[in-house]
Amino acid sequence: MADVSLAERLRNGSVLLLDGGMGTMLQSKGLTSSDCPEEWNVSHASVVLDIQRAYREAGSMAIITNTFGGSPFKLGKYGFGDRTEEFNAAAARIAREAAGDDGFVLGDIGPTGEILEPYGEADSETLRAGIQRQVRGLLEGGVDAFIIETIMDFEELRVAVEAISAESDLPILCSMTFSVVPDGFR
């Protein structure tokens, strides 16, 4: 772990260089479209570690865990929903090793793939409980902060922030994806 906390580093106005894409790198190492990327945290841990070490060697100051699809909802599509905590904890431990003593680990929370009521069938409480399972695994593995990536729905983002905040007081970074529509953005 770094001597200065991630929050302190950001408060001081320091630039924080993140790593690059994980999915494309895993594909270059043999991941197929039918494989679960997060399962590789257990079955191909050395491959994930090598990728993350390469990012550190290239100058990355923070490693993002291989958990973009690490919610029980996404993992369930591969038959791994019951291994949510295991896959997330393994990912955080791998990233922690790659980050070394002076790097940071960001626990990655991606979109759940669920559509919230009233437009879909998912309710906020179910979503929150699922994300909290992911968060607990990431905390067990030793993350320094969380990054919520490419969420399209403000309500899902709110639920994700609440789920993380219910389990931890670590910093939360967020990014959203917007689509251009005729009358602006969505």
Regions found by a protein language model. Name each.
Residues M1-R186:
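Domain-level signal for soluble alpha/beta catalytic cores
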